[in-house]
From Swiss-Prot:
It comes from Homo sapiens (Human). GO terms for cellular component: actin cytoskeleton; axoneme; cell division site; cell surface; ciliary membrane; cilium; cleavage furrow; cytoplasm. This is Septin-2. CDD domains: CDC_Septin (cd01850). Residues 260-270 are annotated as: Important for dimerization. The modification N6-acetyllysine is found at residue 190. Keywords: Acetylation, Cell cycle, Cell division, Cell membrane, Cell projection, Centromere, Chromosome, Cilium, Cytoplasm, Cytoskeleton, Differentiation, Flagellum, GTP-binding, Kinetochore, Membrane, Mitosis, Nucleotide-binding, Phosphoprotein, Spermatogenesis. Residues 182-185 are annotated as: G4 motif.
Amino acid sequence: MSKQQPTQFINPETPGYVGFANLPNQVHRKSVKKGFEFTLMVVGESGLGKSTLINSLFLTDLYPERVIPGAAEKIERTVQIEASTVEIEERGVKLRLTVVDTPGYGDAINCRDCFKTIISYIDEQFERYLHDESGLNRRHIIDNRVHCCFYFISPFGHGLKPLDVAFMKAIHNKVNIVPVIAKADTLTLKERERLKKRILDEIEEHNIKIYHLPDAESDEDEDFKEQTRLLKASIPFSVVGSNQLIEAKGKKVRGRLYPWGVVEVENPEHNDFLKLRTMLITHMQDLQEVTQDLHYENFRSERLKRGGRKVENEDMNKDQILLEKEAELRRMQEMIARMQAQMQMQMQGGDGDGGALGHHV
């Protein structure tokens, strides 16, 4: 009789090993198979290089170059919402990236109501998610909530404009704000540092809540702790974007060519582009968690306080029609039941009369 081989479910080499240590691998495989979803909103005046920066960040032509509107167009220019979704795959990991652009923001002569459209869009995505979450098919919910907002600040001023302050205060309880100084190549290093400090002071002065990177855990390696410290010290990020490849020091780099030299997009000594991209990639999960646990929960609690979830007009009409049909059906069933009862009583009465007459005869 041959000796029976141990099955693959038995691990005699490591007695006492249950297998819980493999759970992170299961979560990783499931997440990679499902893919990730992320929505990024970009807000800022025309001409600050928003489209170029987004294309540079994700190495894709997500946005065409826009034409800066003329003075006549700016008189009554309205804010639009343009959402573009692209599937990005890198080493087997899929990312469904949605970038929400806001052309027209800050371009009109009167900007008093220019950000109402943006706030309405953010609330609509919360509303849609709440509606889907409360429905029957909860396994296939598409998350279009805005997880992060890059707010572009002009480098040509001396800090925040009144519009910047008003807009950020209007959305800071709805979305994670990451302030970005655009076109950093127009500033010297000293000017850049002064502008950063001025913006941070004004953000604190006006009690604006921007996204704060979480502290590194105590068990993280020293390199990650140092990276987190540098990222925090770089806020607001001063960036340069470019989709052009130029030759610098014998190699091809993305950058901008000037008479006095080359500004390299991915050179940390020239600007904070790499730091901004690193922050977005390494903290993408945290941005989603803050959106879910803080901003969405605030919206959901407020909605429930006001009497439950808001139902769209179309759904409300459908529900109303169904209720009316059900009420009509119940009335018909009750009427049929009464008619059947009357017929039953008449039949019983007829049988009694017939029996008496037969007995009398």
